[in-house]
Regions:
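Hydrophobic alpha-helical transmembrane segments of multi-pass inner-membrane transport and secretion
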Residues: 12-39, 248-284, 307-315
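Hydrophobic, regular-secondary-structure patches
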Residues: 27-112, 131-133, 138, 223-226, ...
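Transmembrane alpha-helical interface segments in multi-pass membrane proteins
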Residues: 275, 283-329
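A short amphipathic helical element positioned immediately N-terminal to and/or at the very start
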Residues: 1-9
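A short beta-strand structural signal in non-transmembrane regions
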Residues: 52-56, 149, 173-176, 199-225, ...
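Peri-transmembrane interface segments
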Residues: 39, 211-268, 277-279, 287-288, ...
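Hydrophobic secondary-structure segments that place a key small or acidic residue at a functional site
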Residues: 92-97, 107-119, 125-191, 198
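Conserved transmembrane alpha-helices of multi-pass membrane proteins
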Residues: 320, 334-348
Length: 348
């Protein structure tokens, strides 16, 4: 083993090149997995296991789901829906639309605008207003998520955003513990319905039960009502987990594909390096044989050298990749066709 360690110091350039190639492969693979896990973590953390989501069965997401006012009233009459401190049912009827905003530095991208009621702050406790104030339900006002505020022009407090033929003033900035809500704008649901001439048709209903132990009873009442056959209910966490599957899966497959390509190059490079290392050390090998070292011992030394090179390269690649956790990037959410900001994240 001393022989192996001395070879590292004696042939520094060869060792550095080999270790760098392996480190690059590990870095790319780790970065792809961190990106996929970051998307999953962001979307899954968006939903709460204590909240129930109601959507139209044929919809691929909130944007394509429609729930009319009559259906909402039927759902409000179902058992086990919790009441807030004000005595009102804890249901948030939410229209969800997509608008275009200008990105800082040029270009346009889609942004989700969600209409909510005052009940939503009891349903989603992770929402924290960090600057400004909440929107006035009687005015065309918005609060924006932290990620939107950082990336888009005119998404700062005091700015006005034009859509649906009107000007909407931004009055507050919120964060949501790194969840997907930070990539949205929120305004009053009735104001949004009025602006888009949707009468009482919302995209989704989010509600809380008096006890999650009653979920099966609630679901049974929901599914046995023939008027609700076109709709489905699931926990909010499960909904967002399903939303993350396609995007995270695509990123993971793409990352593995790129890693395989890099791996071929790194493997060939490592093989050439080890072959040349053996070829250049024929005299040393002969000397060791004459000193009484067996072929097995010499082979073990070279195998240990290759293994050590790979381990060092892997550790360095993973160490460098770990710094990606300090970066936040954004991509297109395939289900909502809007911006989704997320951070690279190492899985447990």
């Amino acid at each position: 083993f001393k022989y192996t360690f001395r070879n590292f110091t004696a042939r520094k350039l060869t060792a550095i090149i080999t270790v760098s190639g392996i480190a690059m492969v590990v870095f790319v693979f780790a970065a792809a997995l961190m990106m996929a896990y970051g998307v999953e973590k962001t979307l899954v953390s968006t939903g709460s296991a204590d909240n129930i989501k109601v959507l139209r069965k044929s919809s691929q997401g909130e944007i394509s789901s429609i729930i009319d006012g009559d259906t909402e009233n039927i759902i409000r009459a179902l058992p086990h829906i919790a009441k807030g401190s004000d005595g009102n049912l804890m249901i948030s009827a939410e229209p969800v639309v997509v608008i275009n905003l200008e990105i800082k530095g040029g270009g346009l991208s889609n942004v989700t605008v969600r209409g909510v009621s005052q009940t939503v702050y009891q349903l989603r406790s992770q929402i924290k207003l960090i600057e400004g104030r909440l929107f006035n339900p009687s005015l065309r006002e918005l609060i924006v998520g932290k990620s939107i505020n950082n990336k888009f022009e005119g998404a700062q407090i005091g700015s006005k955003v034009k859509f649906a033929g009107d000007q909407w003033e931004i009055v507050g900035l919120f964060e949501a513990e790194g969840s997907g809500f930070e990539s949205e704008m929120w305004g009053d649901a009735q104001q949004l319905l009025s602006a888009f001439n949707r009468e009482s048709s919302v995209s989704t209903l989010t509600l809380k039960l008096d006890d999650m132990g009653n979920y099966e009873d609630f679901k049974r009442s929901f599914e046995t009502d023939k008027r609700l056959l076109p709709f489905e209910t699931k926990t909010e966490q499960k909904y967002f987990e399903e939303q993350s599957e396609y995007l995270a899966g695509f990123i993971r497959v793409l990352g593995i594909f790129i890693t395989i390509i890099f791996s071929f190059g790194a493997t060939i490079g490592a093989m050439i390096t080890m072959y040349s290392a053996v070829a250049n050390r024929t005299v040393e090998i002969g000397t060791m044989r004459s000193l009484g070292f067996s072929r097995r011992s010499i082979l073990s030394a070279f195998l240990f050298e290759a293994l050590l090179t790979s381990v060092v390269g892997g550790v360095i690649g993973l160490f460098i990749a770990s710094f990606l956790q300090f970066f936040t990037i954004s991509t297109l959410n395939w289900n909502s066709f809007s911006e989704l900001a997320f951070s690279f994240s190492l899985s447990p």
